Each structure stands twice: as structure tokens, then as C-alpha cells.
Amino acid sequence: VANNQSEKTLLRQCPRNSELLQQQRQLGDQTASSTLQLSANKQGGALLLIFVKSGASCFEQLQMAAKLWKIAADHRAERIALSTHGFDSIESHALLNSLLAAVLAGSAALPTYKSKHTTQPLKVISLQQGSANDFATTLATHAGNHLARWLTTLPPNVLDCGNYRHTLQQLAKQESWQAEFLTLAALKKHKADAFLAVARANAHSNAGIMRLRYHSKTNKRKQRHTLALVGKGICFDTGGINLKPHKSMVDMHTDMQGSAVALGTLLALSRLKVPFDIECWLALTENEIGPNAYRPQEVITAANGVTIQVVHSDAEGRMALADTLTLAARNNPNLILDFATLTGACVGALTERMSGAFSNRPQLRDAIELAGRNSGERVWSFPMDSDFDSDLDSPIADIMQCTMDGKGDHILAARFLNRFVPETIPWIHIDLSSGSKTGGLAHIPTEITGFGVRWAVDFFKQHSFN
């Protein structure tokens, strides 16, 4: 309900108008939620209200929508009708999409292994106006986000590299994508020794890089445009030789969330039938400890010939991504976008509320941050000035993997990855500092947020490859 409409308008438009009018007088210009029981409903229904100031940001809309969903979930609602009053058509449509996104995210089941568990009874969602086509973007985005959260929630003994590969192949068949898995033997032929170094201590030989391809039927250009998505898929990260302490290791089954977000983005964009081709490259491995584990001070040659001085085995994500980015770039895509839960430094800089963005094209910065505001998945762009490279100068190799002191590691990690993307290809790197947040984020009620899918869908609504 808009909190800036006249009492006369409120009385005319809204059900239970006298109670609503009293609420509005009490609230003034505040934004708040309220619940009124509908005694006329024999099934014990409820009217759930939120008073919204005009001009609320998308993030604020999603937050408020999540509050309404929580009340509905507590009522064990089987049917929900979503409606807005007092807004113009543009604001009303945006609010309805926020409400729908919150209901879908809140009611979506995630993996559970409890012997007894309850499920949400929601069966029907009704919308006051519009057709399914008006909400196609929200539905496709939810499908991608739910997939990302589902995969990231799975225990590491369930989603190991082999099972992940099988799941991806099944999904590719379902969605009519092409699928190719580069095994360790194939990667050896590609001289992808940075990736292979991380995989050396794995108990099984099931690591590799999955390549999924969506071929747009509406891409009629002679020069077809292609987006390359890249995701970090470390199915479990012990830290390697530089072993993590327990507190830092306990949730490291989620270190593959970058790959899940890249996959969810592929799912959302392909279901929206975007007019460009997509290649999705997922780096799937574990980072284990053992006699074959890679060690500090090794010098490793990546697939593009760049030599790397290893400093810390727990900086494995940038090693696996180095070769994956190199392979993705060989097909000369129009843009490379990678997602990774890469650095604690980015969390330190932004907390878990936002994610960090980096690009080799400064002119993309405004569009990157605009997509964050429009989608409610907020990102902040960090500097990519070339003088940061001096911190990664190595006495024995082309580049150091990282520094010992960790200062600005989110920026240095991006500068490291930049060495594996040709200057001719635009590239965006998202460091997923908001991949997990206690209590959820915006409309997502779970700690694992699947952050990035909504942002990417909005970014490619506005981005032109021309």
C-alpha cells in the first residue's frame, strides 16, 4: 500500500479500509508491515499489509516483501494473492515482481536430510494484474537462483566433482545445452598446469572443467555474439598444505558457489531466450591436503604460458580460474563474466551485504553498479589500476600468486586473474562476498544467497555487445 495517497483514495481502493486508514495515520511517512485477521474467511485467512514510501529502492522492496512472506509462511498459507494499491503502473509492476520473488524464494525447498521435516504448503500464487509473460524474468531468475542455492547447500559427500559432473550433464540434456567435460587428461594436453596443481591431492581423478553451451535461435547475425560465463567450483577446500583452521574450513563445501551462480545465470538467460550465445565454463575440483598437494614456492606454468610463483595453497581459486579463463578466452567471446567466492578481503571491505566487481573496461563500471541497484543485488566496483601489479612482482616467475600480508587481496586477486584474459576481450569479475549471509539477504531467507543471478539477468537486459 502506498503511504503517500490521500485518505479518500485509500478508502476507495483498499479492502478493510477503516483499519488501513487508522494504520496509515499512526505510521505517517514510515514504512512498516502490519497484519489484519480476516474474520470473514472461514479458513482463517489473513490480510498481510506493508505500507511503502514511493521511490523505495529495489533492495528495500525485496526486504519488505520478505517480511510479508515470513508472516504468510508462519500462517502456513496454501494460497497467496499479491496486490498493490496506490502506485502508478511502473511502481506497481516492480512491487509485484518483488513480492513474487520473495514468495518464490521463501517457499522453494532446499536439500534436507532430516528424518522428519516440514514443507511449505503453498500451492497457488495469484497476481492482481498481468500475465505470466509480465513476470517471465522474475520466474526465470528465481529458477537460476534456486538452482544455485540448491547445489551450494548440498553436503560435500553428495556433491563431489563426479556427482556434480553427472548433474550438469543431466541438466544440459534437459535444457538442450551442449556439454563437454575436460578431464584431467584433457587438461594436461591443454597444459592447464595451474588447475592441475590444485587437483593434485584429490583422492579421486574426477576433477575437470565443464563446458556448457547455449545456442540462441534468435541470434541471426553473421557475427554471432557470445557471452562466456566462468565459475569457481571448489567442491571442498581444506586450504591444502596451508591447512585452514576448523572455523574457516567448516563451510568450505560452499566454495563452489561461484560455479553454481554461473550455472544459474546460464539457466535464467537461456530460459529467457536471450539473443546471444553463451558458453559456461565451470572449474570443478577440490583443494585437498596430501603427499601430492602443491606447495608454496613451486613455479607452475598456466595454459597461456604465464609462470606463477606459488605463495599460499589456500589461494587455489585464482589458480583454477587462471586456466579456466584462458580456455574460455580462446573462443574470443564478446564478454567474459566470472563468479567466485574468492577472497576474505572482499568480505572485509564490503561485509556480506554487497559483492565486489572488477573489470578491465572502466566504461562498464556505471552499468555494473546500475544493475546492482536495479536488481537489489548490490555490487561495488573496485579499482583495477595497473600499478597494483607491482605487488605481485616475482623474482623467479612472471607473477606471484598472492602476497604474504594479504593487503588488498581482493584487488590483487583480480589483477592476477587479469593476466589470463586477453586485453582485447571485455571481462567482469564478481567476488561473491555476499554469497553467504546469516539471516539471508534482501528477499532470500537462507544463509546461502545464490547472489549474482539477479544481478546478471538485469545487467544483460541493458548491455549491448555492439
Region locations from a protein language model:
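Short amphipathic alpha-helical segment within the helicase RecA-like ATPase core
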Residues: V1-G233
